Each structure stands twice: as C-alpha cells, then as structure tokens.
C-alpha cells in the first residue's frame, strides 16, 4: 500500500538522526556538511509534515521531545535497513567488476594511494584472492567530487574540510597542514611568533582555487579569525604540490603544505615549519562514493576496509 503523505523522506530522517546524535543543529550541520539554517528548515518542515514536535531548541543545543526520542529510534532502524538495501543494490551493479576507477586529490594520490594499493595487492595475494585493477587519476578535491557524482569514478578521495552533500563518505586518514618557509626567510629568523592574522594578510604560494589544501587553510583561518576574515591574494597559484614546494624553496613566499608531502624537507632542514599559535591545521582525509553511509559491496568496500584498517 502507498505510504501516507505524512511520511517524510529518507533525507529528513537522516538529518533528524544527525540532530539527535549531535545534540544540536550546529553539530548536525557540521556532520552533514550543511548550513545550520538548512538543517533548521528541514527539521521544521519535517515537524510540520508529521504534525509532531520533535525537538526543543535551547541555549545549550537541541533537546528531543518524548516523541522525538521515539522517532530517532525508528529513524536509526529505518536508515540501517536503507543502507543495507543501498549496499545490496550497489553489489548488484558491481558484481563481477574487478576494475575500480579511483580519483584522488593530489596529496592522497601521491603520498598515500601507492602504499594502500601495494599493501592491498600483497594481502589479496596472501589470501589467494583476485586482485582488483585500480585505475587511479590524480586531480584536485573539487574535480574528484564531480567525477564521483557524474559516475566517471567509482570511488574518490578528497581533502576538503567538510564532507560533500549527497555522497557517502568515511574518514580514511588524518593529515596536518604546515606553514613552511626556506631557511633564509624572515619568519625563520625572528623570535616573535607569526599570528593567524599576519598569515592571512601575507601573500602565499598556493594551489589552485577549490583545491583541498587551499580550502582547508581558509577554513582554519575563518575558524580562528571569524567568517569575515580577509585573506591576501596569493603571490602564486600553482597546480601541484611539487610546484608549490619549488616556488617556496626559490623564495617566492610562504606556503601551507601537507606534512605528508614535505616530511623529508622538514627532517633535513630544506624547509622550516612556522608555528601559528591558535590555528588548528589538522584535517581529515575522506573517501567518497555515490550512495548511502555504507560503501558499495564488492571490490570498493574491500579496498576501503583495507585502508581504514591500516589507519586505525
């Protein structure tokens, strides 16, 4: 029989469950990669549709009503079944496929994917299993998201500060941005610390717009200085970490780079890390796919299970 018009869609239940788990609209918004206003509107729409108050907004967050507690339990069960169905449909689509099209941001493609792929191959060979063929394309995070959405890639890896909406995702690794300069730079010689505001006002060597590293630095500066923070235009925009590194070594200016990409430079003193007090430059690296919270069954899920087991 058809569902009642009072029955919300799965997205509404997913947002409401995120509110219940986070305890606030803001926490749910951060978890889902939405604005707090969008989450608030969706909750109000859901309450109007079903005709029941689900949560009470307080100064300390969002408190579920008795009805909201019951609906949250139902939502968890419903989404668990939906994830199983979604994963099963994905299994039907990918059954027998031994080729995985992967698109990854450059830092992940260069610094992490080779190790993950080699260790997966070794593990599969030890078990006597079939080794899937991984076709890897390196790009920036924005293009990786678009490739997964458009079906060009089966799996993506990104560095963005927030998970993209409408895609499943899981954290697969953690990284840290490091502001670096060559040994002769003025920041390397002075005793006074560099502030977050001074960093924001300094022209930097950067990656191209919408790259994960550039977006992560901007997000960290806004968290520290406020949403109205003004950032100086870059002195150079380059399309690869290698080009950024070379420009910094040549004296073009400071840059924020992945610690994964410059570990040797820091160890041997070719580049020096600049401490920026109160600026949180730690970040999460994510895998993304089309579908729900559970990745598609088969080779894709096996690859992600292998990666996450190594990162824990």
Swiss-Prot record:
GO molecular function: DNA-binding transcription factor activity; transcription cis-regulatory region binding
Key words of the record: DNA-binding, Transcription, Transcription regulation
SUPFAM superfamilies, per database record: Periplasmic binding protein-like II, Winged helix' DNA-binding domain
Superkingdom field: Bacteria
GO cellular component: cytosol
Alphabetized Gene3D superfamilies for the sequence: Periplasmic binding protein-like II (3.40.190.10), Winged helix-like DNA-binding domain superfamily/Winged helix DNA-binding domain (1.10.10.10)
HTH lysR-type domain: residues covered: 8-65
Record InterPro entries: LysR_subst-bd, Tscrpt_reg_HTH_LysR, WH-like_DNA-bd_sf, WH_DNA-bd_sf
The keyword Membrane belongs to this UniProt entry's keyword annotation: no
Keyword Kinase: no
Any one GO biological process: regulation of DNA-templated transcription
DNA-binding region: 25-45
Family: Belongs to the LysR transcriptional regulatory family.
PANTHER family registered for this protein in UniProt: HTH-TYPE TRANSCRIPTIONAL REGULATOR (PTHR30126), HTH-TYPE TRANSCRIPTIONAL REGULATOR CYSL (PTHR30126:SF39)
Protein name: Uncharacterized HTH-type transcriptional regulator Rv2282c
Organism: Mycobacterium tuberculosis (strain ATCC 25618 / H37Rv)
């Amino acid at each position: 029989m058809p569902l009642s018009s009072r029955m919300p869609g799965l997205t509404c239940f997913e947002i409401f469950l995120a509110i219940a788990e986070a305890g606030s609209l803001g926490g749910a918004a951060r978890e889902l990669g939405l604005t707090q206003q969008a989450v608030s509107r969706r909750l109000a729409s859901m309450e109007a549709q079903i005709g029941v108050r689900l949560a009470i907004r307080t100064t300390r967050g969002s408190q579920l009503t008795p009805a909201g507690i019951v609906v949250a339990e139902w939502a968890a069960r419903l989404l668990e079944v939906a994830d199983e169905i979604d994963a099963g449909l994905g299994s039907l689509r990918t059954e027998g496929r031994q080729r995985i099209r992967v698109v990854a941001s450059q830092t992940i493609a260069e610094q992490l994917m080779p190790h993950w792929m080699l260790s997966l191959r070794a593990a599969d060979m030890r078990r006597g299993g079939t080794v899937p063929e991984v076709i890897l394309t390196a790009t920036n995070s924005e293009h990786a998201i678009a490739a997964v959405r458009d079906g060009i890639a089966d799996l993506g890896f990104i560095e963005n500060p927030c998970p993209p909406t409408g895609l499943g995702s899981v954290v697969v690794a953690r990284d840290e941005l490091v502001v670096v300069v060559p040994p002769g730079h003025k920041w390397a010689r002075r005793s006074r610390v560099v502030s977050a505001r001074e960093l924001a006002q300094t022209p930097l060597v950067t990656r191209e717009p919408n790259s994960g590293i550039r977006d992560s630095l901007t997000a960290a500066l806004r968290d520290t200085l406020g949403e109205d923070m003004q950032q100086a235009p870059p002195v150079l925009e380059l399309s690869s970490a290698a080009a950024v590194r070379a420009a910094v070594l040549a004296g073009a200016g400071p840059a924020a780079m992945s610690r994964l990409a410059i570990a040797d430079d820091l160890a041997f003193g070719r580049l020096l890390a600049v401490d920026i007090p109160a600026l949180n430059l730690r970040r999460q690296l994510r895998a993304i796919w089309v579908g729900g919270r559970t990745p598609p069954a088969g080779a894709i899920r096996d690859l992600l299970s292998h990666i996450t087991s190594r990162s824990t």
